Amino acid sequence: MNKTISTLLGVGFLLVSLVGCAPSEKPPDPNEQYEKIPSYKHTVEFLGENTFPIGAWMAPPYDNEVTPIPENYISEQAFKDIADSGINMIYALYDRCDNTTTMQDSRNINVMNSLRYAEKYKVAYFARDWNEMALMEEEDTAEMRKIYDEFDKIPSFSGILVQDEPGLVHFDNLSAMKKNFDKYFPQKTFYTNMMPTYATDNQLNQGAATGGGSPSTIELYQKYVKDFISKVKPQMFSYDFYPMMNEFPNIEKGYFENISIVASETAKAKIPFWTFIQATSWGGNVRICTQAEIDWQVNTSLAYGAKGIQYFSYWTPYDDSGTHPGYYPNRTDEQIGSMVSHDGKKQDMYYRVQNTNRNLTEAGEILLNCGFAGIIQHGESPDEIPEKDLLTDFRQLKGVSGVDALIGCFDKDGKTVLYVVNNSIVKEGEVSLQFEKNVKASIVQDGKTGSQEGETVKLKLKAGEGALICL
């Protein structure tokens, strides 16, 4: 049974305004302090310690012999577009480097060009190596370093994308690779993205690319997360769960359970977690997301304590010919819905993500340094939230009324921080927060800052929208 906090009646609406104290009310105490809650983050060196990581897969590609893409899309404009969308990290795929050749190789020249453009527009760049297994042996690592040392002369070089969705069988090798990488590049990120709970048992054991198998168990998934953290010792845990499947407004079950498992295990290990946002479609059941669906994914992740947000995908993948969108037989770019088409044109999804990132950039800077305490649920939820994560109240907050909502509860240096989310992808509405006494609230909503003062704070939230409250 879900715990919910008491429903309170309220009238009127106030989005972000300043309300004076009635003569009988006690003024807010600006020095009120609570016990501090630990906070964990991974700093991407190029971005700085107070910039919230906002990543995307994949970077603008170049023409190459493996995937015969007809043009080189690495350009200054392409990286300006990345930055203008609010994304500050980009992961390579087709634009791979090659440590078995020299810096004069066209592949490495293309990566260097990407790094220079990324530096100009303040985008952290994660390289993808053709031969990352060279990190297994010290003598091979020495050869790899010749290339990486050149990359490292450009500040935007932020690490390497090692493997996407590995299985349990890969963890020992990944551990050895990370140890070698960390010897020489301790300030860079050894990046690996992990699978969701709906991966099959065979995929969790052997890696996503193997396919097949039976539905996995939660116990196996917990082992998968724990073993990766204990063996590989990542700087953060990145994973994906794509919930917008089948017909709108269905949301795939298990979304919050997956976040809960990852949040719990990373907190034990004292590392942060990053998560991917579904920003494309594929197959016959994964749909193109609306603005509300993008907002809901990002904002529920923030409410659960995510310290990094990533989008799949920025550039549309290719088919084997390199001339058409990949993975999606007989579909156009518009029917796929990534941020940028396979030939470099901005699509509707680009502007949806850009809209979401306005608030994410501002609120994320504060949440990055906040310790997560739990979730308050008001009303119904499209997916069940694990009982162990639910709070009935938090510090000064004693009641909630209005539309279905989630309130992520945080601490920042002994002060209360709340992240309020409209927990619907269909309807907008008002959420009222009732406090035990008069409070002065600083509010970040839609990238803008305002304030309210009183025993009640009221927010009007679009479907899926989130707002940050600092007391």
Each predicted region: which residue ranges?
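C-terminal motif of bacterial Sec signal peptides marking the signal peptidase cleavage site
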Residues: 19-20
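Short, conserved catalytic or interaction motifs in soluble domains
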Residues: 23
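Bacterial N-terminal signal peptides that target proteins for export
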Residues: 1-9
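Glycan-processing catalytic domains of CAZymes
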Residues: 27-438, 445-471
